Amino acid sequence: MKRIKKIIVNVTSVNLAAIDADAIVVPEFQHCALHSGIGITIAKTYPEGMQKYDYYAKAAGSSLGSVVVTETGSATCKHLLHAVILGCCREDLFACVKIAVEKALVLADENGALFVAIPTLGTGVAGYLSVEQSAKAVFAAVAEFAPFAKNIRRIDFAVSVSSVKVVEDILQQESYLDCETEIDGKKFGEWIYTLCNQLNSGVPEVSC
């Protein structure tokens, strides 16, 4: 746990959907992303918020690094903040996550959130970042946002149990500061992303 300006930042292994936050940042879920990881949890817990995002994405489209806010219909977590990072190239993903998280925090703050939960971003089957790199991007975004926060007073960063200590060390040692970009955390994200697209397009064969 660490205080950054007025915001308490906490590293937790609690399931993202079980965190009693006012708003939750989620990666944009498309294609096969909903069939694994936090995609299933969020879709089951906040189906209204996911359905609203699907409608918006089909009607208006979205650009990398942007964030879309949807209402969940829940009495506890009122908003999902959908960070559009899926499909970002390896070289730009760290910066894309950082930009999207900062935008998400601004939007959550504008909507009156006091408590925001954020998962690791860019680390899934279609991502390139390691958990450590994702943590640096998220914490860097929090540090840039914190001086301007009007409402947000707590941020929980949700990671796996095995990653808590290494991520907590990054937070305490402030190794995320002045970190502009990091690449090559994972090598297979591009192939997985291509596979997902081909499966959804009905292409029967995938070479690797």
Give the role of each language-model region.
Residues 86-206:
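Phosphate/ribose-phosphate-bearing ligand recognition and processing surfaces
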Residues 1-111:
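Glycine-/small-residue-enriched capping loops at alpha/beta junctions
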